[in-house]
Amino acid sequence: MLFNPTGLTECLQEWEDLEKDYQQIQDTHRHYKHKLEEVSKLQESCSSSIARQRKKLKDLSESLEECKGAVNPEDVNKIDDIQESIKERPNVFFEMEAFLPKKNGLYLSLVLGNVNVTLLNKQSKFAYKDEYEKFKLYLTVLLLFFSFTCRFLVSYRVVDALFNFLLVWYYCTLTIRESILINNGSKIKGWWVFQHYVSTFLSGVMLTWPDGELYQMFRNQFLSYSMYINFVQFFQYYYQSGCLYRLRALGERHNMDLTVEGFQSWMWRGLTFLLPFLFLGHFFQLYNGITLFQMTQLPEWKEWQVLMCGSTFLVLFMGNFFTTLGVVYHKYMDQDKAKGL
């Protein structure tokens, strides 16, 4: 409970106490700034040391390859051991750099400027990752209900525009947050990040598509697709988050690993039942692309959005389908090799 002085004597005593506290605050803040300067110097020293190590390891690796042909078998084994150790270093450096400031990529530089987005402790990183996952879950549920409303309950172009605007904002926000998470040590496969840029572009084109005969022809199909995709994404989040939790507890996954709108190798154990739902979603994208290209053959076609959306849906299909297929193929190949051993 705060002390409220009443008389002059009490006020003067309170002032003296406040002065002492003020001096203590100044000393603490001065000490804090000094430590920050020390941390900055340590960060610069560590970053430059890692860069120097990388260069020297690269040069050493090339020199060892040249030496292999001119040494005896015993020395070849030594070289192999060194090369194995060299191969492990990039992963260690990656873990170190997750706690060091780094230059933003082109996208983050354009959006945020030269702002340091590296979080310097594990608690902050995990809290940001957890907040990202919750954001995806809440927006997925919202988009599912919004698309259902537009498909079955409301049929106004202005409501469709609000839905598409929400999609643009959602995917834009995802790309920014994912870039920050990558800066902080999350390993997200290239396509699963890039597809969000493609989806942002697609949603933006859908937003600008004027109301007309062709728009109305494609509207219900697009909303049905949106409902299905959001349902699958919710389904994926539910099962992927549980699987990631178990794998982290076993020490088989990194704390900064994320749920994705696709299939990755770590999902092979226990989540293969998701594959039919994913492939159906991929072929839905192909169906949308074909439908839109067929619309360009109609005499009513005059909007550029028809061709652009059709091309974008085909890009999404090819990227999603072949990336997922590649993961499945590599897992089968790995299993065959394991059986052969």
From Swiss-Prot:
Pfam families: TMEM120A-B (PF07851). GO terms for biological process: detection of mechanical stimulus involved in sensory perception of pain; fat cell differentiation; monoatomic ion transmembrane transport. It is a multi-pass membrane protein. It is found in: Cell membrane; Nucleus inner membrane; Endoplasmic reticulum. Residues 1-131, 177-189, 240-269, 330-341 are cytoplasmic. GO terms for molecular function: coenzyme A binding; monoatomic ion channel activity. Disulfide bonds: none annotated. The transmembrane domain (TMD) has structural homology to the very long chain fatty acid elongase 7, ELOVL7, despite low sequence homology between them. Multifunctional protein involved in mechanosensation, and plays an essential role in lipid metabolism. May function as a potential ion channel involved in sensing mechanical stimuli. TMEM120A is structurally similar to a lipid-modifying enzyme, ELOVL7, and contains a bound coenzyme A molecule, which suggests it might function as an enzyme in lipid metabolism. This is Transmembrane protein 120A-A. The gene is tmem120aa.
